[in-house]
């Protein structure tokens, strides 16, 4: 294994702001890791994700110090369109990423923009739809699907680009617990089958505790905790505005720390 993401002494503040949104971030992520990033609202999670695919500083302007390297490339120097074939990003609201008339067209959009031959585009579309279990939705309009189905389509559209990393910013924010768990299990399956590096921003720690290889807790723009779920979830996370999964919470109470 080697570092697919390497961040050194990263600081960032948005244009017009005196406050640093990210402060002194040092982070290495290995190829094939399933990493959960969590923390209270406004702690810098989304901003960190934007740094991974070049949206910062190439789209969101501001002052950036330090370095962000993904798959050996400096994201501040590589066009966002090229980075998109390496780092795929899925947002909270899947409908914001789906704008074609059919599921098939949405999934084909990325590979088409890579300039791939038609037969390769078709192969990738078929593969991505099959991997996500949504081949039966191929000719449906994305906007008549359920939230869970839409999120699967959004993930399939990213997967068709065959990225090395998929970054998901609270992808189940609008989904019920059952549908959320199905999405998380799907991500773990893709992580295992494809050795796909998964970076998941999430508050639903109860649902992802058993899936993550690693949990990163952010607070006030900094990484304050970084370790395995076993190491992180037995700590008192309430100081960071978080609740650990129920079993570690019970352990804390029995140990006199909760």
Per-region residue spans from a language model:
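Conserved ABC transporter NBD signature motif
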Residues: 61-73
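Conserved catalytic motifs of ABC-family nucleotide-binding domains
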Residues: 162
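Catalytic Walker B motif of ABC-type/P-loop ATPase nucleotide-binding domains
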Residues: 166-169
């Amino acid at each position: 294994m080697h570092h697919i993401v390497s961040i050194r002494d990263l600081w960032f503040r948005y244009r017009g702001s005196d406050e640093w949104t990210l402060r002194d971030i040092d982070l290495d992520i290995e190829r094939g890791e399933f990493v959960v990033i969590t923390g209270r609202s406004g702690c810098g999670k989304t901003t960190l994700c934007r740094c991974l695919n070049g949206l910062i500083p190439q789209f969101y302007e501001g002052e950036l110090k330090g370095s962000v390297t993904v798959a050996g490339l400096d994201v501040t120097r590589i066009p966002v369109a090229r980075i998109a074939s390496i780092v795929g990003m899925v947002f909270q609201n899947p409908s914001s990423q789906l704008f074609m008339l059919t599921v098939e067209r949405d999934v084909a959009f990325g590979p088409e923009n890579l300039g791939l031959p038609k037969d390769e585009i078709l192969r990738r579309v078929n593969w991505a739809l099959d991997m996500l279990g949504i081949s039966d939705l191929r000719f449906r309009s994305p906007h008549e699907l359920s939230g869970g189905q839409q999120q699967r389509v959004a993930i399939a559209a990213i997967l068709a680009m065959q990225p090395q990393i998929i970054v998901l910013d609270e992808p189940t924010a609008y989904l019920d617990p059952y549908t959320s768990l199905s999405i998380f299990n799907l991500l773990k399956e893709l992580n295992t089958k494809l050795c796909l590096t998964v970076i998941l921003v999430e508050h639903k720690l109860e649902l992802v505790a058993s899936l993550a290889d690693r949990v990163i807790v952010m607070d006030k723009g900094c990484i304050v905790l970084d370790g395995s779920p076993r190491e992180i979830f037995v700590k008192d996370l309430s100081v960071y505005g978080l609740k650990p999964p129920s079993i570690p919470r019970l352990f804390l109470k029995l140990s006199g720390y909760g």
